[in-house]
Amino acid sequence: RTVLTFTDWKGNKVLERHIIDEKDGVMADTYYVYDALGKLRFVLPPALNDITRSIVKSWDIRSSGALRRYAYFYRYDNRMLLVEKKLPGADPVYYINDITGTPVFCQDGNLRNGNRWKYSIPDRFGRPVLEGLCDAPDAAAVKQKFVHVYKTDFANTASSICGTGYCPNIALKTPSLLTASYYDDYRFLALQQFKGLNRMGSRNARGLKTGTMTAVLEPITSQGDSANNTKTTPSEICSVVSYDNEDRIAC
């Protein structure tokens, strides 16, 4: 099957044409639409060829059912950072980026129905340490700072997010935890959730992931033969990663 690729003067791909049947002139075209700054704004797959080959010069993705079902759409802010993405058949996904351009918050259609956002907060080295859900953040405040975990307190977790020992430099409204990740050392073993877990192997784990705390979204209670045998899954599943002297995972 023949595939033809067309580019503009900047080298951006604007059309990819698959020749399905050369004799009958059957083709499947995918168009790539850019803005004046060269940022990809639309991808129009072959399912939209009836629209793209018509004499109509403009289309509205908000009112065209075909575009909502099949088109890829991307929107950027004045810093050229992605703030909205729409994939075929799905509701838009919104992003809020901090001053470094890191997407800290995002919201898809399902989260929007519950007025919730997903947060992803790194440490000062850019490693993901906190992921979870919260109510609508202060977008203006997020855009003006480098959002990260600025301190850890594993002895007194009252001021940390969901008892993780992590304290970010931005307020989260009604947060819930999905995952917390730990690096470099094993000080987090002081947390109540890690009670009974121990590390083994090398003491030097700098630069390596040493543990995780993952939330159990729907705790399940199993009833045994009697009420005394009732068991409930924990609200978090915790794990510790140990390394040998050559930084290989030991357990």
Language-model features, listed with the residues they occupy:
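Beta-strand elements of repeat-based all-beta scaffolds
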Residues: 1-251
